[in-house]
A protein has these predicted regions:
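Charged, low-complexity intrinsically disordered regions
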Residues: 35, 53, 60-65, 69-217
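Cleavable Sec-type N-terminal signal peptides
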Residues: 10-18, 185
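Transmembrane-cytosolic junction motif
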Residues: 17-41
Length: 217
């Protein structure tokens, strides 16, 4: 019996070591890809930033909190600040986030969620209400949620529908918040996809100029 337990213990230990080695290799490859992408875009790379994500409240941040930005790339393509990072919440990486600063700031937030993301409510829209968001309606293959129905309707037109349709199902949510356009992307996406979603974000940010800007006294 004791011999069997020893064998089982050894097997478990070996399996744990293998998992750790594979995870380390994955992280190393991920870090290398992120550094190379930063280099190609004349951007900066940082291993982590625990402060950056505190400015956002919607998208994946509405469920798991601010979390931490890992494997962060920051730059200014076309003069606008861009961030690319892996979002860690509760000790696990839940998505890759791209954030592009918009030329204007608005108090109106617009989220475009996949049907599966919209269905995470309890059927009565509880999850949307908790974040102060109301269902605006379908926009192409996604569902739009907002904190200001009247203002958000200004930004919904055929151009937005076309942008939604080319976004891809690996983007769980596309949203405008404050002075940012953001996308939550599947963590398995690579450099080519990061480029594609960056271009989609630029288009989305331009369309969100229709949201009413914050007016300072």
């Amino acid at each position: 019996m004791s011999t069997t337990l020893i064998v089982v213990g050894v097997i478990v230990l070996v399996a744990a070591v293998v998992v750790l080695v594979l995870d380390a290799r994955h992280r190393s490859a991920r870090s290398r890809a992120r550094r190379e992408w930063a280099g190609r875009h004349s951007a900066r790379y940082a291993v982590a930033d625990p402060v950056l994500t505190g400015q956002w409240r919607h998208g994946p941040f509405s469920r798991g909190g601010a979390g931490t930005a890992l494997e962060l790339v920051s730059g200014e393509p076309d003069g606008n600040t861009l961030y690319l990072f892996d979002l860690e919440q509760g000790g696990a990486v839940v998505s890759t986030v791209l954030a592009l600063r918009r030329p204007t700031t608005s108090d109106t937030t617009v989220e475009l969620r996949l049907g599966s993301e919209a269905a995470t409510t309890d059927g009565d829209g509880a999850a949307a209400s908790e974040a102060g968001m109301d269902l605006l309606g379908p926009v192409g293959s996604r569902y739009a949620f907002t904190n200001d129905l009247e203002s958000a309707r200004r930004a919904v037109d055929q151009r937005l529908v076309l942008t939604v349709e080319v976004t891809g199902e690996d983007v769980s949510v596309l949203w405008a918040e404050g002075s940012w356009a953001l996308a939550a992307l599947d963590i398995t996406a690579g450099p080519q996809r990061w480029d594609e979603v960056t271009a989609i974000l630029a288009r989305f940010a331009e369309l969100m100029r229709l949201l009413p800007p914050v007016r300072h006294p």
